[in-house]
Amino acid sequence: MSTSLAEPMLAWYARNARDLPWRAPGATPWAVLVSEIMLQQTPVARVLPEYLSWMTRWPTPAALAAEPAGEAIRQWGRLGYPRRALRLHETATILVARHGGSVPADLDALRALPGIGSYTAAAVASFAFGQRHAVLDTNVRRVLARLAAGQPWAGGASSAASVAERRLAESLLPAEPAVAARWSVAVMELGALVCTAASPRCGDCPVARECAWLAAGRPAPPAGTAGATGAAGATGAAGAGAAGTAGTAGAAGAAGAAGGVRVGRRRTQKYDGTDRQCRGRLLAVLRGASDPVHRADFDAVWAGQAQLERALDGLVADGLVDPLPDGRFALPGSQPLSR
């Protein structure tokens, strides 16, 4: 890999990296794994307080495995996508049973854990164990598509990394494993803070002079792709639109103001009135109760009976709620305390 990319990227990260607890020198592999699961589809600001509470209560896999799965759901609070809490609890029990209570360093062993895909396995192996792997989250994929391929990345968070993306990422990894791991988190941070989807700040980018996308004039994704905007007069995608800076090689300089122009806007998903909101309300009732709850407790927080039934059935099917023989409902593993 060219030092023209590695050196400025790593120097920028050393100056600008956010102070996050899972990046601290003493962070354990378990801490890194928990953070990666929590950060799936959830921003850092929401994760941070819940992560700190979780790690205070369950600093090791054994501590979590010793409690019922329902307690993991209760502690998960309002982070969303609560099946992640179930997967973390299941992972903890597997770590205790098969790995001596420790997170394995082997990539295949990590992939075999519940809810751990290629990205999360590579992230844990890299960030917790200093290994050399391509870590391809949304931010990294966007940065590398722009920087090395000169392309506006039009993928979405739910799209899987392609073979071409993986090969590109692997070709850019520094040879030394520890440096490669730091490179991976540096690229991720650059995508989160500077090379953002909708408002990239090219003037603050440490590798702007090497950026093929900037040199090409920041081309937009094709119409109809994820990130392309349908607004009349818009010139770019989510990820396009910040002005180039004078003196940056190849920049399409005067396209915007000094602070950058926001061109594409992400569509916000409707939440009010959805099944997801209903599920959240029902889980909130259970999380706030010390005993199992009656059906009437659910009726009190959601008026639409058909939707309530559908949401409750889904929670039961997902293993997030246990229906009890007496007609009440509880978080999984909870013991009825009273009638």
What positions do the PLM features span?
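Catalytic cores of DNA base-excision repair glycosylases
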Residues: E7-P221, T225, G250-V263, D272-R279, ...
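Long, intrinsically disordered low-complexity tandem-repeat segments
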Residues: T225-A258
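A short, conserved structural fragment
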Residues: V316-F329
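Short, amphipathic alpha-helical interaction segments positioned at domain boundaries
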Residues: Q335-R339
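Short amphipathic alpha-helical interaction segments
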Residues: W302-V316
